[in-house]
Amino acid sequence: MAKKPASFEYNGTLVKVLDGDTIDCYIDLGFDLKIKKRIRYMGIDTWESRTRDLDEKKKGLAAKARNKELLEAGVFKIVSYGTGKFGRVLGEIFVSPDAVGHEIAENVDRSSDGLVSINDILINEGHAYEYDGGKKKAFVAEIATEKAAKKEDLVDKPAEENQEEEWQKNNG
Protein backbone atom coordinates (compact mmCIF):
# COMPACT_ATOMS: atom_id res chain seq x y z
CA MET A 1 0.00 0.00 0.00
CA ALA A 2 1.03 3.63 -0.42
CA LYS A 3 2.86 5.66 2.23
CA LYS A 4 0.54 6.54 5.08
CA PRO A 5 0.29 9.65 7.28
CA ALA A 6 0.89 9.64 11.06
CA SER A 7 -1.31 7.12 12.84
CA PHE A 8 -2.76 6.03 16.17
CA GLU A 9 -3.52 2.45 17.24
CA TYR A 10 -6.62 1.24 19.07
CA ASN A 11 -8.38 -2.02 19.81
CA GLY A 12 -11.79 -2.36 18.21
CA THR A 13 -14.87 -4.52 18.67
CA LEU A 14 -17.23 -5.05 15.74
CA VAL A 15 -20.75 -3.65 15.84
CA LYS A 16 -21.73 -4.09 12.18
CA VAL A 17 -20.19 -4.70 8.75
CA LEU A 18 -21.71 -2.18 6.35
CA ASP A 19 -19.91 -3.36 3.21
CA GLY A 20 -16.54 -4.64 2.05
CA ASP A 21 -14.61 -1.55 3.15
CA THR A 22 -16.69 0.06 5.93
CA ILE A 23 -17.60 -1.08 9.45
CA ASP A 24 -19.15 0.30 12.61
CA CYS A 25 -17.22 -0.59 15.76
CA TYR A 26 -16.45 0.35 19.31
CA ILE A 27 -12.98 1.84 19.67
CA ASP A 28 -11.30 1.27 23.02
CA LEU A 29 -9.73 4.59 24.07
CA GLY A 30 -8.37 3.19 27.35
CA PHE A 31 -9.45 3.88 30.94
CA ASP A 32 -12.76 2.07 30.28
CA LEU A 33 -13.70 4.64 27.61
CA LYS A 34 -15.17 3.38 24.35
CA ILE A 35 -16.61 5.29 21.42
CA LYS A 36 -18.72 3.98 18.54
CA LYS A 37 -17.34 5.06 15.16
CA ARG A 38 -17.68 4.26 11.48
CA ILE A 39 -14.39 3.10 9.97
CA ARG A 40 -13.64 3.41 6.25
CA TYR A 41 -10.73 1.18 5.23
CA MET A 42 -7.96 3.46 4.02
CA GLY A 43 -6.29 2.78 0.70
CA ILE A 44 -8.85 0.33 -0.72
CA ASP A 45 -12.26 0.25 -2.37
CA THR A 46 -14.67 -2.64 -2.89
CA TRP A 47 -17.68 -3.14 -5.11
CA GLU A 48 -20.89 -1.64 -3.74
CA SER A 49 -23.34 -4.04 -2.12
CA ARG A 50 -26.23 -1.57 -2.27
CA THR A 51 -26.73 -0.98 -5.97
CA ARG A 52 -29.18 -1.85 -8.73
CA ASP A 53 -26.37 -3.31 -10.83
CA LEU A 54 -26.71 -7.03 -10.04
CA ASP A 55 -23.17 -7.91 -11.17
CA GLU A 56 -21.64 -5.27 -8.93
CA LYS A 57 -24.00 -6.18 -6.08
CA LYS A 58 -22.94 -9.85 -6.22
CA LYS A 59 -19.26 -8.89 -5.90
CA GLY A 60 -20.06 -6.31 -3.23
CA LEU A 61 -21.92 -8.87 -1.14
CA ALA A 62 -19.00 -11.31 -1.49
CA ALA A 63 -16.59 -8.59 -0.26
CA LYS A 64 -18.92 -7.78 2.64
CA ALA A 65 -19.19 -11.46 3.61
CA ARG A 66 -15.41 -11.92 3.54
CA ASN A 67 -14.91 -8.74 5.58
CA LYS A 68 -17.39 -10.04 8.17
CA GLU A 69 -15.72 -13.45 8.25
CA LEU A 70 -12.31 -11.87 8.91
CA LEU A 71 -13.67 -9.76 11.78
CA GLU A 72 -15.72 -12.45 13.55
CA ALA A 73 -12.74 -13.55 15.63
CA GLY A 74 -13.48 -10.72 18.06
CA VAL A 75 -11.16 -7.88 19.03
CA PHE A 76 -9.03 -6.39 16.25
CA LYS A 77 -6.53 -3.58 15.92
CA ILE A 78 -7.40 -0.29 14.19
CA VAL A 79 -4.60 1.90 12.90
CA SER A 80 -6.30 5.27 12.46
CA TYR A 81 -5.12 7.89 9.97
CA GLY A 82 -7.61 10.62 10.85
CA THR A 83 -11.01 11.46 9.41
CA GLY A 84 -11.98 11.35 5.73
CA LYS A 85 -14.07 13.69 3.60
CA PHE A 86 -17.35 12.10 4.77
CA GLY A 87 -16.54 12.21 8.50
CA ARG A 88 -15.58 8.55 8.82
CA VAL A 89 -12.41 7.41 10.55
CA LEU A 90 -9.88 6.27 7.93
CA GLY A 91 -8.02 3.20 9.06
CA GLU A 92 -6.29 -0.05 8.44
CA ILE A 93 -7.69 -3.05 10.29
CA PHE A 94 -5.46 -5.84 11.60
CA VAL A 95 -6.57 -9.32 12.69
CA SER A 96 -4.95 -12.54 13.82
CA PRO A 97 -3.42 -14.56 10.96
CA ASP A 98 -5.65 -17.45 12.13
CA ALA A 99 -8.73 -15.50 10.96
CA VAL A 100 -7.52 -15.52 7.34
CA GLY A 101 -7.88 -19.26 6.82
CA HIS A 102 -5.08 -19.68 4.25
CA GLU A 103 -1.42 -18.88 3.67
CA ILE A 104 -0.77 -15.15 3.83
CA ALA A 105 1.10 -13.46 0.97
CA GLU A 106 4.36 -11.64 1.71
CA ASN A 107 2.97 -8.30 0.49
CA VAL A 108 0.38 -8.17 3.30
CA ASP A 109 1.14 -5.53 5.95
CA ARG A 110 1.81 -6.91 9.42
CA SER A 111 1.65 -5.06 12.70
CA SER A 112 4.49 -5.17 15.22
CA ASP A 113 2.58 -7.85 17.15
CA GLY A 114 2.14 -10.14 14.12
CA LEU A 115 -1.42 -9.24 13.12
CA VAL A 116 -2.26 -9.01 9.39
CA SER A 117 -3.99 -6.24 7.43
CA ILE A 118 -7.57 -6.92 6.33
CA ASN A 119 -7.14 -4.11 3.81
CA ASP A 120 -4.35 -6.04 2.06
CA ILE A 121 -6.08 -9.42 2.44
CA LEU A 122 -9.16 -8.06 0.61
CA ILE A 123 -6.94 -6.75 -2.22
CA ASN A 124 -5.02 -10.04 -2.53
CA GLU A 125 -8.24 -12.08 -2.62
CA GLY A 126 -9.75 -9.89 -5.36
CA HIS A 127 -12.45 -8.29 -3.19
CA ALA A 128 -10.85 -4.82 -3.33
CA TYR A 129 -8.39 -2.68 -5.23
CA GLU A 130 -6.02 0.07 -4.14
CA TYR A 131 -7.86 3.38 -3.99
CA ASP A 132 -6.65 6.90 -3.17
CA GLY A 133 -9.98 8.70 -2.95
CA GLY A 134 -10.25 9.62 -6.63
CA LYS A 135 -12.70 8.37 -9.26
CA LYS A 136 -13.67 4.70 -9.00
CA LYS A 137 -12.65 3.77 -12.53
CA ALA A 138 -11.15 0.30 -12.06
CA PHE A 139 -14.36 -1.42 -10.93
CA VAL A 140 -16.51 0.38 -13.47
CA ALA A 141 -14.24 -0.79 -16.30
CA GLU A 142 -14.08 -4.36 -14.98
CA ILE A 143 -17.85 -4.67 -14.67
CA ALA A 144 -18.33 -3.22 -18.17
CA THR A 145 -15.89 -5.82 -19.54
CA GLU A 146 -17.72 -8.66 -17.77
CA LYS A 147 -21.10 -7.47 -19.08
CA ALA A 148 -19.73 -7.28 -22.62
CA ALA A 149 -18.41 -10.85 -22.30
CA LYS A 150 -21.84 -12.06 -21.08
CA LYS A 151 -23.57 -10.40 -24.04
CA GLU A 152 -21.04 -12.04 -26.36
CA ASP A 153 -21.83 -15.44 -24.82
CA LEU A 154 -25.56 -14.88 -25.37
CA VAL A 155 -25.02 -13.93 -29.02
CA ASP A 156 -22.98 -17.07 -29.68
CA LYS A 157 -25.71 -19.43 -28.39
CA PRO A 158 -28.93 -20.40 -30.15
CA ALA A 159 -32.06 -18.62 -28.84
CA GLU A 160 -33.55 -21.82 -27.36
CA GLU A 161 -30.41 -22.43 -25.30
CA ASN A 162 -30.48 -18.84 -23.96
CA GLN A 163 -34.17 -19.18 -23.04
CA GLU A 164 -33.56 -22.52 -21.31
CA GLU A 165 -30.62 -21.05 -19.35
CA GLU A 166 -32.72 -18.04 -18.30
CA TRP A 167 -35.61 -20.29 -17.23
CA GLN A 168 -33.23 -22.49 -15.17
CA LYS A 169 -31.73 -19.42 -13.50
CA ASN A 170 -35.15 -18.03 -12.55
CA ASN A 171 -36.90 -21.29 -11.66
CA GLY A 172 -34.00 -23.24 -10.35
Which ranges hold each PLM region?
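Small beta-barrel nucleic-acid-binding modules, primarily SNase/OB-fold domains
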Residues: 1-172
